[in-house]
Amino acid sequence: MFIKSISAIAAAALLSVGSSVQAGGSMLSSWYGGYFHGRTTANGETYNMYGHTAAHKSLPFGTKLRVCYQGCVDVRINDRGPYIGARELDLSYGAAQAIGLTHPGVDYVSFTYI
């Protein structure tokens, strides 16, 4: 009985951790554009600055996020970065423009996994 109780507690803990990770949150975001347009991304695709993609240091390629600032946009992780300070997400110019992030350029955005 004791082992079953511990197993149930461990399972509940894992479920709560998994659901909180998948829930989303906020992160410091920036955008990148012209200089990288047409170059190869970390996953081998050609970067399209007008597309709705993003770079993240560790999320798996293909991960889809709904990113919100003044509006919301769905993006797919296809590159690595950003590598400047505390920034965690680098949106394509098109995605940043869709949510109103091109000016100021860097700010906290909210996100959820989709």
Q: Can you say where each PLM-predicted feature lies in the sequence?
A:
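Secreted/periplasmic proteins
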Residues: 2-114
